[in-house]
Amino acid sequence: MAKHLFTSESVSEGHPDKIADQISDAVLDAILAQDPKARVACETYVKTGMVLVGGEVTTSAWVDIEEITRKTVREIGYTHSDMGFDADSCAVLNAIGKQSPDINQGVDRADPAEQGAGDQGLMFGYANNETDVLMPAPITYAHALVKRQSEVRKNGTLPWLRPDAKSQVTFAYDDGKIVGIDAVVLSTQHRDDVSQADLIEGVMETIIKPVLPAQWLNKDTKFFINPTGRFVIGGPVGDCGLTGRKIIVDTYGGMARHGGGAFSGKDPSKVDRSAAYAARYVAKNIVAAGLADRCEIQVSYAIGVAEPTSISIETFGTGKVSEDLLIKLVRQHFELRPYGLTAMLDLARPIYQATAAYGHFGRNEFPWEATDKAEALRADAGL
């Protein structure tokens, strides 16, 4: 493999699309806390001075959509009208209805194990051994940059920061191995009274240098900090935000393929979300077991049918055993029917708001990041 560059981006919790994702998942969590069997599909739209929460829900729970929305926006940091978006004064519109009974009859079964998929679709899971969390380095460090921006904004280290921010990191590879970081982009919303010089110094010394490993930075690494020179207008004033519009940020930063389905606002019966989590769990355990250095798995489903319609695995020439054997091991060790994978990963509980910013993968607090199957996979592979 020749030398090449690869780039991934991330966005902060204050980015308009991420505000929408977090509100959708906050509503989902509130419902699941009361009714773990609820069916939820919650979509959010944010723009200057308003939030629209819509979707389809079937549940015995009652939740206060307006209060959940305001609390979420407040925690993100939009608390002043001079930002153009204020948790306490924005309009909150509720357009949630009931899920179609046609979907219910396809999903629900007398035997829970035979629960059908909530929709057709294809999902991918991926892992590689570039980082200790078995994730691609570009997306891992792109997330780390905007997460650090949030930390130093909230703890007052850089009091002129505001919630909206974006990062982008370009890694240089040689023969598939990382040899350095070629370029770093970080754009952050800020107060009007900070100078460009102070902003660049603060971001470099307080955000970039503490996050990016020094051994990957060199004299040729390029840094672009607020390259337009000014980022005062941001958040929902600058752009409208929608749930599900940051699916590459949410997953592998473009290094793996994506089936197209978004995650936030969806309960575990929606395989767009739950099967993508299960696919990550499978891929990570295959890499953790040493059966491949890189692994991508695809699963697909038909609405109302429990068994996956297909399972395929690609190891990009790094596999230690055949891909046919890997598929056999996956069928043997992992439950990929909707009810089974929900039980396997304990997904019917309120854990989702935390996923809605800084990536759904590579964060060990989530159950799909466990590597508890690695030893058994390795043994059964004969290694």
Curated annotation (Swiss-Prot):
Pathway: Amino-acid biosynthesis; S-adenosyl-L-methionine biosynthesis; S-adenosyl-L-methionine from L-methionine: step 1/1
Region (Flexible loop): 99-109
Cell membrane is among the record's keywords: no
A single GO BP: S-adenosylmethionine biosynthetic process
Catalytic activity: L-methionine + ATP + H2O = S-adenosyl-L-methionine + phosphate + diphosphate
Cofactor stoichiometry and binding remark: Binds 2 divalent ions per subunit. Binds 1 potassium ion per subunit.
A Pfam entry, by short name: S-AdoMet_synt_M
GO CC annotation: cytoplasm
Binding site for K(+): 43
CDD domains (UniProt xref): S-AdoMet_synt
GO molecular-function term, one example from the UniProt record: ATP binding
Superkingdom as given in the UniProt entry: Bacteria
Keywords: ATP-binding, Cytoplasm, Magnesium, Metal-binding, Nucleotide-binding, One-carbon metabolism, Potassium, Transferase
Cofactor(s) demanded: Mg(2+); K(+)
Residues that bind L-methionine: 56, 99, 239, 270
Binding site for Mg(2+): 17
Assembly and oligomerization: Homotetramer; dimer of dimers.
Role description: Catalyzes the formation of S-adenosylmethionine (AdoMet) from methionine and ATP. The overall synthetic reaction is composed of two sequential steps, AdoMet formation and the subsequent tripolyphosphate hydrolysis which occurs prior to release of AdoMet from the enzyme.
HAMAP family cross-referenced by the UniProt entry: S_AdoMet_synth1 (MF_00086)
Family, per entry: Belongs to the AdoMet synthase family.
Protein name stated in the entry: S-adenosylmethionine synthase
Encoding gene, per UniProt annotation: metK
